[in-house]
Amino acid sequence: MRNVDKQDNLVRAFKALLKEERFGSQGDIVEALKNEGFDNINQSKVSRMLTKFGAVRTRNAKMEMVYCLPAELGVPTASSSLRELVLDVDYNNALVVIRTGPGAAQLIARLLDSLGKSEGILGVVAGDDTIFITPTLDVPVKELFHSVCELFEYAG
């Protein structure tokens, strides 16, 4: 199985477990993922995933403190309102740069992060109104630039 497929399966299993709203500790999540066949999982990886997907601890129906992924913290999609936040897209021989309206970079970056390596995105760094996107080794910067422009319907 390819690395990207393994990662996608891990993310799906992780999100499915959190939807159950029964895990009170990161250790509980690690054990559940190991039981599902993810042998390389550890507490620090679970911690990073909790942060990446915006998980929070809240009380479930039994009044237990558990990790969950609230719907309002879900990954945004490229709706028309997000497209309007992208003011400029450019690139050089190393990365793609997106300029957004003030305060919008984090929202756009979260969408791009959710696409991940399967779409040629190695990593995303966002400030207040600027985003740097680094492509994976197998994707030329120009190709990633065109993909980003297409995603946000940016004509330049």
Curated annotation (Swiss-Prot):
Pathway: Amino-acid biosynthesis; L-arginine biosynthesis [regulation]
GO cellular component: cytoplasm; transcription regulator complex
Record keywords, A-Z: Amino-acid biosynthesis, Arginine biosynthesis, Cytoplasm, DNA-binding, Repressor, Transcription, Transcription regulation
Primary subcellular site in the record, as a coarse category: cytoplasm
Location in or out of the cell: Cytoplasm
UniProt-listed GO biological process terms: L-arginine biosynthetic process; protein complex oligomerization; regulation of arginine biosynthetic process; regulation of arginine metabolic process
GO MF, one example: DNA-binding transcription factor activity
Protein's UniProt keywords contain DNA-binding: yes
Record's function text: Regulates arginine biosynthesis genes.
Family per similarity comment: Belongs to the ArgR family.
Protein name: Arginine repressor
Species whose genome carries this gene: Vibrio cholerae serotype O1 (strain ATCC 39315 / El Tor Inaba N16961)
Name of the coding gene: argR
